[in-house]
């Protein structure tokens, strides 16, 4: 991970936000900042390599962070089962690259421990 990537991920730790974010929105914001792809572009469905990679990382982090795993990710991110399965496999394969694994680990560390949006959790 380059120093710029680390700064991008760490920048969210020092910000305060005035609205309540849904868990998938929070993950999207952190991933889009770390990967330097605007959140609106990640959501656009564009198939360009860097954009689809950011989208797949978003889904991967959601699937590994949310208590409901894949099913919860499919519901929250509005993604089909096969598409999600492909994305998760793609990201797992990319984790063999130390630089990519460092970036993904930094993103995962930046996620709150409790991503439930239910009261009392």
Regions found by a protein language model. Give the residues of each.
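General nucleic-acid-binding
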Residues: 1-29
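Short, amphipathic alpha-helical "recognition" segments used to contact nucleic acids or chromatin
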Residues: 52-67
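Short alpha-helical "recognition helix" segments of helix-turn-helix
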Residues: 71-80
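Helix-turn-helix DNA-binding helix
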Residues: 83-85
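Short Lys/Arg-enriched helix C-cap and helix-to-coil transition segments
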Residues: 95-120
């Amino acid at each position: 991970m380059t120093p710029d990537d680390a700064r991008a991920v760490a920048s969210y730790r020092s910000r305060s936000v005035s609205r309540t974010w849904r868990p998938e929105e929070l993950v999207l914001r952190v991933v889009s900042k770390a990967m330097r792809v605007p959140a609106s572009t990640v959501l656009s469905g564009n198939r360009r390599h860097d954009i689809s990679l950011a989208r797949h990382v978003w889904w991967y982090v959601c699937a590994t962070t949310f208590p409901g795993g894949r099913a919860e990710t499919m519901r929250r991110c509005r993604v089909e089962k096969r598409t999600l399965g492909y994305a998760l496999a793609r990201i797992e394969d990319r984790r063999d690259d130390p630089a990519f694994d460092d970036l993904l680990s930094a993103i995962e560390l930046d996620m709150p421990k409790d991503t439930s949006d239910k009261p009392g959790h």
